[in-house]
Amino acid sequence: KRGFTMYVWLALVITLAIVIGAKVFVGKWPVLRQRFGIQSPTEYLKTRFGQPAQLTIAISGVIMKLLDIAAKWAAIGILLHGFTGIPVWAGVVVSGLVSMIYITIGGLWADLVTDFVQFIVQLGAGIVIAVGVGTALSERGLSYLTMWGELNTIQPGFSNPFNGDYTMLWCVLYLFAKTFEYNGGNWNLAARFISTANASEARKAAVLSATMYLLWPLLIFAPMWAARLLFPNLADPASELYPLLTQTYVPTGMVGLVLAAMFAATMGMTVSDINTLSAVTQRDIAPAFSARFRSMIEQPRTSLRIARVITVCFTVITIVIGLNANSFGGVLSLVISWFGAMVGVTGVPLLLGLFRTFRHTDGRVTIGSVVCGFLAFALTKLLPDFPSDWEVATPLIVCAAVFILGGLVNRALGRDVRTDADALLTTLAEPDRVDVLTP
């Protein structure tokens, strides 16, 4: 619908967000595992801010991630409908059930393998589609570089970096939100960084991810931009265009592989999310309410069984939400207006809590910052004329302001920093000089 701006606000913004994180944030995540033995992203918050703040962030984050995962089910339902003609609701249910079985049995390792294999298949298919569309353009005397003039005649502004609601201000504010999300505010990404060997390896992973975000979307988006010229009369381009490109330019036997890869890509994201939700619930939320549960998770077999039950329950909930995605404004609204706006509210204390600079921000201030962030989010939804540029970033800005100002007030009042929290922050201050504990 909007053209080149999609690459700017999605690919370029996220690339910059991850580059910033590679320098500032991600090196601290493996240190938490090496030095303090944490496994879930919110586990360290108990030492840093106390259990009430940890629970507030963990429970809030679980609710948000359920919306994000549901949006992914809805998205794959739309794709399956475009490829096969099955109803969208059936695609959501089938995707959810297959993924539930897969992640329950295979865990995070199965997710990593799926991610790698689906990328290889998608890379091959993406190249085939790009070459096929490029050939079709050349038959019209055009190329990917020269097609923009004709595209702009069909829809003025199609080649603009900022188009419609996606203004320069919107992109700058979105960068602010994505910097927190893609460097640990989104828990499944924090889990990936936690699982790297050390701070240096975490940074390398971030740089590789940023590079792929810069290059890979061009291979996917360029044929779809060009397809506005090749297939100008589609009734519903959002659901018809990519399946039509695949069926037109990819050899018949490979179409099934592309569909499988798209399915696996969605499954790779969702199972990673659900795996992390299960870890947070099992290690950080449930033990706070039950001494019996705390003792149960110390037993490996029992712990695994509990994790699988939690995984199944969460998957069912997200399928139900995915079936009702239109109630939230559709897939894009779920991803941007709901999850994208709220993830920073829990991401601010999760990431800024890693830095000694903010050591005077305590648990009470942290809970207050999260509450204020969610109130700001509610305000953006309740006010009918709230500026679209500020919708995503406002909750995060409010949360960050309360978090930082509250810490400054504590410092001015001379309130002490907890000894265990201060020791944690001192260790994190130099992530490359950590003595690695033997597992």
Write out the residue ranges for each language-model feature.
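Hydrophobic alpha-helical segments and their helix-loop junctions in multi-pass secondary transporters
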Residues: 69, 73, 77, 81-94, ...
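Transmembrane helix-loop junctions in multi-pass membrane proteins
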Residues: 5, 67-79, 103-109, 223, ...
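Hydrophobic, small-residue-rich membrane helices and short re-entrant helix-turn-helix hairpins
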Residues: 37-46, 107-116, 182-215, 237-241, ...
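Helix-loop-helix module between adjacent transmembrane segments
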Residues: 9-103, 174-182, 264-272
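Terminal cytosolic tails of multi-pass membrane transporters
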Residues: 367, 387-439
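Central hydrophobic cores of alpha-helical transmembrane segments
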Residues: 364-376
